[in-house]
Amino acid sequence: MSVMFDKIPTQKYNYGMILTYSDIVKKETSVRKARKAIFDKKYLKIGHGLYCQDIIDYDSLEVIFSRYKNIIVTLNTAFEIYDMVDRNSSKYTIATVEWSRVITSINVDQIFTSKKYFNIGKTKMLYQGFYIYIYDKERLLIELIRNKHRFPYDYYKEVVNSYRKLFINHELDINKLRKYLKHFTYGNSILSRIMEVIV
């Protein structure tokens, strides 16, 4: 049985079980045994060079991070992971550096980002048993304002309300936000718009 990458389901399963061919060789102790194990369907192919031991042993976000290295979770998917919205998107929203190769998976919404801004607010998170890179809440607030046109009005308001709660509870680092915005064109204007909506 082969599960191709562009048809990976979006449901959550057990985590941290993605294996490369090299992992299988180490686990089976030889190339011959590894090939036999794959032939005997002990390991299921879920993408180019990626395997799992059981169809329920992987999550599609884990596969994405196994296959593409220089990516960051952003916008809709990040808002969901941070519990800032009460809904689930059908696609994962992933930021890559501009001019990166196109991610061809049907369940990825790829956002091309200027190299100048790409790593601002990037943080490593243990998520469902595997590590991902995701923008912190301060960087996401900047992206929310910069990309307001991407969102339906009710979705945008839901995220804004979550940020208002963070601000009221002193869980939003305004100094960090100001520091980030020094790197952005029209940073002062973005800050003014942010303060208008969250205060």
For the regions a protein language model found, what residue spans apply to each?
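Short amphipathic alpha-helical interface segments
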Residues: S2-L19
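Active-site-proximal helix-loop elements at catalytic-domain edges
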Residues: F39-D40, S89
